[in-house]
Amino acid sequence: MESLTLQPINLINGEVNLPGSKSVSNRALLLAALAQGTTRLTNLLDSDDIRHMLNALQQLGVQYQLSADKTECTVEGLGQPFSVKDFTCLYLGNAGTAMRPLAAALCLGQGEFELTGEPRMKERPIGHLVDALRSAGADITYLENEHYPPLKIKGTGLDGGEVSIDGSISSQFLTAFLMAAPLAKSDTTILIKGDLVSKPYIDITLNIMAQFGVQVENQNYQKFIVPAGQVYQSPGEFLVEGDASSASYFLAAGAIKGGEVKVTGIGKNSIQGDIQFADALEAMGAEIEWGEDYIIARHRQLNAIDMDFNHIPDAAMTIATAALFAPGTTSIRNVYNWRVKETDRLHAMATELRKLGAEVEEGDDYITITSPTQLKHVAIDTYDDHRMAMCFSLVALSDTAVTINDPKCTSKTFPDYFTKLEQLSR
């Protein structure tokens, strides 16, 4: 297995222009494909997850032109749901942002489809979404294990009506249903069962739907009303914001070992909830400056915090490694959905932090980290999870080197992450 050893970094300073957001890129690509008109997307993320979505759209008859650097894509909208004559098998790797929304969208049109992916995708639950889609008239069959991909979908249209979705495991189930609902046969009312996790990701979905001309009534995240008969209309141009989850590593680095680090491509008006990571860093003691299209983090002594991170679970992972630099015990609470991500992130994070010498308690939906006085040089296993690799790169901001196993797993969202980190390192 390939590995990368990062030597201790004395100072972090400089500016990073962020790659496009994964969450925004795949939502916008899907809506551009369904929309009337042609959409030019700029600052598109070039990564594995986006490639899986683009390949799927191509198989579904969508025509697009991708620039040489793959960050600009012009999509010819179909102006209607996907319909294919022949049985179509779509391979989606481990891209939840492709699997879940496509599962809902393919119910709308005509044709028979199989949705599958790599082994980890077959361990990531999709039952709550399938239950909701079936209650709206969808014809979906599990091909292997109940409640998990791969799926067989027979497109017959969605009826609409009143539907319940369990929101406690993943907000992507609700996102998927919301994006399909305007094209259902009648108005859809979606009722949320349980506590909805990752609410800011629903805000991203509703914001992008609005940019494509579709309105949804959101009643306090407990009830969503989507009128039928709406049509997605291309906005013409669509700028993909920088990825706020990816910003977290650089902002944390600035807080731990700045100088200062400026990330551009997101700012105080971003539609991504993960910019609230900067507030968590500020709570730990970092100095944060907000601009229209940038955020700056400057070094200050960090302190341990105890916080609920249900709203920003992805960025909360970065707090777990930043906690190594904050004397005391940091508690990251209400993050059960770490367990159903690219890997079981609670278990993976606890295991690797302990290797470094931290004292860790792993609960069902929380983790506490007591920072050690001295970090050990160890090889970090990354579990084929891009965020594990990027989070643990921060260990090099100590006086100890760190070895990252399988560093190329960052290709899921940020293929040149380690190059960018090196450019800021002194």
UniProtKB/Swiss-Prot annotation:
InterPro entries: Enolpyruvate_Tfrase_dom, Enolpyruvate_Tfrase_sf, EPSP_synthase, EPSP_synthase_CS, RNA3'P_cycl/enolpyr_Trfase_a/b. 3-phosphoshikimate binds at residues 22-23, 27, 170-172, 198, 314, 337, 341. This is 3-phosphoshikimate 1-carboxyvinyltransferase. Monomer. SUPFAM superfamilies: EPT/RTPC-like. It is found in: Cytoplasm. Its EC number is 2.5.1.19. It catalyses: 3-phosphoshikimate + phosphoenolpyruvate = 5-O-(1-carboxyvinyl)-3-phosphoshikimate + phosphate. Phosphoenolpyruvate binds at residues 22, 96, 124, 172, 345, 387, 412. It comes from Photobacterium damsela subsp. piscicida (Pasteurella piscicida).
